[in-house]
Every structure is written in structure tokens, then in C-alpha cells.
Amino acid sequence: MDLLYISPEFPPNYAHFIENLNSLGVSVWGLGETDFYFMPASLRSALTWYARADLNNADAVQQGLDELLEQKKACGHAGNFDLVESHNEQWLTLEGMINEKYGIDGIKKKDLPRLKKKSIMKQIFEGCGLPVARGERIADINRALDLADTLGYPLILKPDEGVGAGGIYRVENKDQLKSHLSHIAEDYLIEEFIDGDIVTYDGLTDYDGNVVFENSLIYGDGVLDYVLGKDTFFYVSRQIPDKLRAAGQKLVPLFDIRRKFFHFEFFKMGDTYMPIEINCRPPGGAILDMMNYSIDDDLYRAYARMIAQG
């Protein structure tokens, strides 16, 4: 099997995916932005070949892909890659474009809106009967002001397409709303402010979309507290409430998540779970390592084993 891994250098702990894939006989071809020799020796030795490219430049990416395919052919690996993986929301669009161009199974261009746009996620949540925060994508400032009057303050202003807490604002009054909107060019959503705890339903699916691992995080604070520089915290829960599991497992097939990690965020209000957004990637940073400790196992190895077995 030949797997193209986008950005093998970041985050650093994700090198364990590549090392485990390599140990199970998967040929991993890397396309990233860092210098090859800036990566750890263990990662370098696990890559069959590595091409460096500016991943935000389409021409540079194509040159990198051409180099990899040429080397792949020279090594006796004819044809395209079998799979493409990024494990990083930043490169999900690139992953879909490569799959589309080379006819590789996986996320395609048509799948990206539901995996990246919060307004479309919200429609899917509502369509399957889950409660959502009141609000909508705003078309212009007049509609935004009318909607704000209906929802009341405080409210949340967040980008329709964004990663993590970037670009999210808590708006206390009309003047603040006007000020924020005057600096915004991209599509944004306005939603009512929800006062609730934030929990997650996280996991890994196999090739058929079956959940083969599940876990949950409990946040001590919300993402806005992190944006404000507060010393926030979160922890892994070994016990997943039945209603949270049911809501999470309802969403997995609706978003067609196959052979991938997922990270779903919910508001918890009593025993009600309100979805916030979904992410078709592992939870960020060192959270996978936390989850490994919580289950006394190795998710990097489990992922590699699932991929290698097909």
C-alpha cells in the first residue's frame, strides 16, 4: 500500500502515525513544507520519499506530487497513491483536491462544504433532530442587526469556515457588533450565546465507517476563555454518557466519516447535548497521547493497523 501523508512534520507527535504505518509495511510518501533534515531521524527513516513544497501554492504542490510519483515509479510502485491523509484540518481541502484529481478513494471536493462550513453542519444537525443554537449565516449588516435584536445579547459571532477558536467573538451590544462586522470580509454566523459546559465525542472509524474507538473530553472552560488568554484546562473521561454516545454515533454516518478520526463538540445542558461543530480529524495537540494514557493503548498503532489491514 502507498499512502501520501500531507505535512508529516506537524504536529510533531503525529510522526508516530507514519512510523507505525511504515512498521506495518505501508509505504508512506510525504509532502510537506519543512526541510527534510529538520525532521527527526525516526520520521525521516519511516518515509519512503519526501517532497518539500509550499502547501498553499497549487503549482508548488503539483511539482511536489510529480516528484513523488516519479520516485514512486522508479521504486517499482506503479500507479497513483492508494490513500491520502493529512490528519490536519488546515490541509483537508488539499487532501480532497488530490483525491479528486487522481481518482483516489476518500474525501472529494463535494464533501468539503459539510466538513468545513458550520452553516451546513447546522443544517445536518437540525435535519437529524438534534437541538442547535438559534442563529444563521449573515448576508449583510442589516440582517445581522435584525437577527441580533431577535436573539438578544450577548451573542456569538464566528466564521462559517474556520479552525478552532480563531475569529470567534462574544458580542455584548450593537456597537460591538457593528465594529466587528466592519472588519469582516468572509462569511460569518451569528448565534445565541449558550451557557453550558463543552464536551466532545471523539473517535476513529474503519473503512466502512464503523466506530472502532471512542472517547470524550470535558472542557473546564470554553474556547473564548482560551482566546482571552485564560489558563484553561480539559480532561479525558473514561465514561461516555449514553445520550452523548447516541448523538455522536448518529452524526458519524451523516458526515460519511470513513477510515478517519473525528472530533465532535457539544454543549452539555443537563442531560441534553447540543452539537456545536464537527471536525474530520483527531483532537488537536497532545490529546491523542492523553487518550492513549486513558485506555492504556496506542491509537497511533491502532490507526496504522486499521489502514494496513484495509
Q: Residue spans of the language-model regions?
A:
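A short, flexible beta-alpha/helix-coil linker loop
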Residues: 105, 161-164, 281-284
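Helix-loop-beta segment of a Rossmann-like dinucleotide-binding subdomain
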Residues: 102, 162-163, 228-232
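Active-site nucleotide/adenylate-binding loops and adjacent lid/helix of ATP-dependent enzymes
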Residues: 117-195, 206-208, 234-246
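ATP-binding N-terminal substructure of ATP-dependent carboxylate-amine bond-forming enzymes
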Residues: 1-110, 142, 309-310
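Short hydrophobic patches on amphipathic alpha-helices
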Residues: 65, 69-72, 148, 181, ...
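A short, structured active-site edge motif that brings together acidic residues
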Residues: 108-119
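ATP-dependent carboxylate/phosphate-activation module, predominantly the ATP-grasp catalytic core
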Residues: 192-257, 261, 268, 275, ...
